[in-house]
Amino acid sequence: MAIELEDLGLSPDVADVMQRLARVGAGIARIISRNGLERDLGAGVGTNAGGDGQKALDVIADDAFRAALEGSAVAYYASEEQDEVVTLGEGSLALAIDPLDGSSNIDVNVSIGTIFSIFPAAAGPEASFLRPGTEQIAGGYIIYGPQCALVCSFGQGVQHWVLDLDAGIFRRMPDIRPLPAETSEFAINASNYRHWPQPIRAFVDDLVAGAEGPRGKNFNMRWIASLVAETHRILMRGGVFLYPGDERKGYERGRLRHVYECAPIAFLIANVGGRATDGCADILTALPDRLHARTPFVFGCASKVARVAAYHDLACEETSALFGSRGLFRS
């Protein structure tokens, strides 16, 4: 046994897949803890299907998860590191995975992770993943940080496990609490401010204005450049995360992948009372048009995400002309 799954009512097939994912996750945690002692896990080794640079650990993780799922109920394996869906067998499930999220942080000892989602297998490989996120059986992640933790939702709340290093087992912890309605943290890469669309600039301007601004309170900005780490913080204490599309070439639809990253995170957030959108429309009801499709991504406390959508509902010229520096909304 690699993870405690009692009392969750999972089907034998899903439970077996979770055991396999947990076993590989524990192994990757051990490999990461020895980075540099035997090999450089952050060494560049090529590019993936999306054109992003691959690190050695990206490939190690992808190979390990794919091998572990052979002989399981997973018929189709879709990975951010693979050009196409890999057919593993005749099973009833399909699994999408970002084997190693945040790999730019490998060499600086910052939390990285694995993001995954499980769907019922459809009639064909791509059809199993080009579907609404509401059809997920499970969505979750493993975070490799000071603790190695696994967080997953099966559609009823969000469950949380921590790796017991001595026993090699993910121990069940209390479930994640519903997200708070109001918090004072937001996460965005502010260095790209000049490239953002006007609604995102206006939203962030109002937060940065603090107690003297239209929101009437001070906010703190966070940015880790690891989606798993950002998600874990928001699940633990609330807030909102923004990765908008912008005017740079290749960034028009943001950089995060709908299938491998955004859909499973959106599933988690929805199951603690939060919301996830592309800035306007809900991620979970959107249909990706290809495996490696990218999307702008805003998620976290429902009220904050709704506020971002409200900024988008106003025309950019109206935003500038009517509100200027006093902001769009009063708190």
From Swiss-Prot:
EC annotation from Swiss-Prot or TrEMBL: 3.1.3.11
Annotated Mg(2+) 2 binding sites: D98, D101, E261
Catalyzed chemical reaction(s): beta-D-fructose 1,6-bisphosphate + H2O = beta-D-fructose 6-phosphate + phosphate
Keyword Metal-binding applies: yes
Manner of cofactor binding, per the entry note: Binds 2 magnesium ions per subunit.
GO molecular function, one term: fructose 1,6-bisphosphate 1-phosphatase activity
Protein name in the entry: Fructose-1,6-bisphosphatase class 1 2
Gene source species: Cereibacter sphaeroides (strain ATCC 17029 / ATH 2.4.9)
Gene, per the UniProt record: fbp2
